[in-house]
UniProtKB/Swiss-Prot annotation:
InterPro entries the record matches: ATP-grasp (IPR011761), ATP-grasp_succ-CoA_synth-type (IPR013650), ATP_grasp_subdomain_1 (IPR013815), Succ-CoA_synthase_bsu_CS (IPR017866), SUCC_ACL_C (IPR005811), Succ_CoA_ligase-like_bsu (IPR005809), Succinyl-CoA_synth-like (IPR016102)
Keywords of the record: ATP-binding, Ligase, Magnesium, Metal-binding, Nucleotide-binding, Tricarboxylic acid cycle
HAMAP family named in the record: Succ_CoA_beta
Pathway of action: Carbohydrate metabolism; tricarboxylic acid cycle; succinate from succinyl-CoA (ligase route): step 1/1
Encoding gene (name): sucC
EC number, as in UniProt: 6.2.1.5
Official protein name in the record: Succinate--CoA ligase [ADP-forming] subunit beta
PROSITE patterns: ATP_GRASP, SUCCINYL_COA_LIG_3
Cofactor: Mg(2+)
The family this protein is said to belong to: Belongs to the succinate/malate CoA ligase beta subunit family.
Length: 388
């Protein structure tokens, strides 16, 4: 779950980290009033969406008058911002952030993620602030400096100083950087985050460090113990199908193809998408119904998949372990009948009571194709899309 920039900065303030004074606004009038609260300009106005690349898309602007602030707010509030990180529809702009402009001398980068290979929280710092860190990692990886947090001791001040020295910082900037490093690490661990990023972390012309931007990603599996973060969730920024799937504990990710996929198990779901592509098809989604593939969840999964107008066929791939395939077949038959599926449905069942389940599908009289194996399922669903 991602947070908006203004929400990230509110969290920074609670932990004593330096950030520009700013206010999130939902109307042009609020935006003008925010400028008055901040004081003399110039100000920076920023569209609040869960996507990068806002500046290049016109969603960030430095302004010198309250009239310009009102014009920016009137232009963007209620509209959608399209960036290189969004789809063609963009993201809705429901708030803009008005904050004091900062005199920038130098831009740095500081962020942290959970590194699965080392099984540690890893902090990354670079002198290449203001640039996508993925681009820096690809083109100039030697400019990214890393430290890993020990899960027993947690963050240590010497690690912050180590990064500061590698960035070429001196004097009070080393102390300021170390404080920010320790604060971010504390936020990351206490708030169950999956990602934290300040890009850019700037050195002002007055010689101080300030968090000019903020990006936080919370671990969705830990939100039950982070009620205040859960309240910050903005579902308008999420794919509505993904939000609907989450309510039914379905793992759904929309893709660009035309073959809907419904599978139990994340690994099997990825393998299913691979074999569909191997046979010339394009998956329309990743959807893992999990171990409890009940009729109700299967029905809901069909509704979500078919809400995508691009879907021309559906492949259901179920491995029956604890769950019996004949019960899954009953669920599929009931779901197809209830939802009114008008596209071909190819079903591959394997495991516990698979033969009984396949017979039920064959005898149902519905437009359901029972596949004999995974390869056969992929070939049949691709052929169905091609009208063969």
């Amino acid at each position: 779950m991602n947070l908006h920039e203004y929400q990230a900065k509110q969290l920074f303030a609670r932990y004593g980290l330096p950030a520009p004074v700013g206010y999130a606004c939902t109307t042009p009038r609020e935006a003008e009033e925010a400028a008055s609260k901040i004081g003399a300009g110039p100000w920076v106005v920023k569209c609040q969406v869960h996507a990068g690349g806002r500046g290049k898309a016109g969603g960030v602007k430095v302004v010198n008058s309250k009239e310009d602030i009102r014009a920016f707010a009137e232009n963007w509030l209620g509209k959608r911002l399209v960036t290189y990180q969004t789809d063609a529809n963009g993201q809705p702009v429901n708030q803009i952030l008005v904050e004091a402009a900062t005199d920038i001398a130098k831009e740095l980068y500081l962020g942290a993620v959970v590194d699965r290979s080392s099984r540690r929280v890893v902090f990354m710092a670079s002198t290449e602030g203001g640039v996508e860190i993925e681009k820096v990692a690809e083109e100039t990886p030697h400019l990214i400096h890393k430290v890993a947090l020990d899960p027993l001791t947690g963050p240590m001040p010497y690690q912050g100083r180590e990064l500061a020295f590698k960035l070429g910082l001196e004097g009070k900037l080393v102390q300021q950087f170390t404080k920010i490093f320790m604060g971010l690490a504390t936020i990351f661990l206490e708030r169950d985050l999956a990602l934290i990023e300040i890009n850019p972390l700037v050195i002002t012309k007055q010689g101080d460090l300030i968090c000019l931007d903020g990006k936080l990603g919370a671990d969705g599996n830990a939100l039950f113990r982070q009620p205040d973060l859960r309240e910050m969730r903005d579902q308008s920024q999420e794919d509505p199908r993904e939000a609907q799937a989450a309510q039914w504990e379905l793992n759904y990710v929309a893709l660009d193809g035309n073959i809907g996929c419904m599978v139990n198990g994340a690994g099997l779901a990825m393998g299913t998408m691979d074999i569909v592509k191997l046979h010339g098809g394009e998956p329309a989604n990743f959807l893992d119904v999990g171990g409890g593939a009940t009729k109700e969840r299967v029905t809901e999964a069909f509704k979500i998949i078919l809400s995508d107008d691009k879907v021309k066929a559906v492949l259901v791939n179920i491995f029956g372990g604890i769950v019996r395939c004949d019960l899954i077949a009953d669920g599929i038959i009931g779901a197809v009948a209830e939802v009114g599926v008008n596209v071909p449905v190819v079903v591959r069942l394997e495991g516990n009571n698979a033969e009984v389940g396949a017979k039920k599908l064959a005898d149902s009289g519905l437009n359901i194709i029972a596949a004999k194996g995974l390869t056969d399922a992929a070939q049949q669903v691709v052929a169905a899309v091609e009208g063969k």
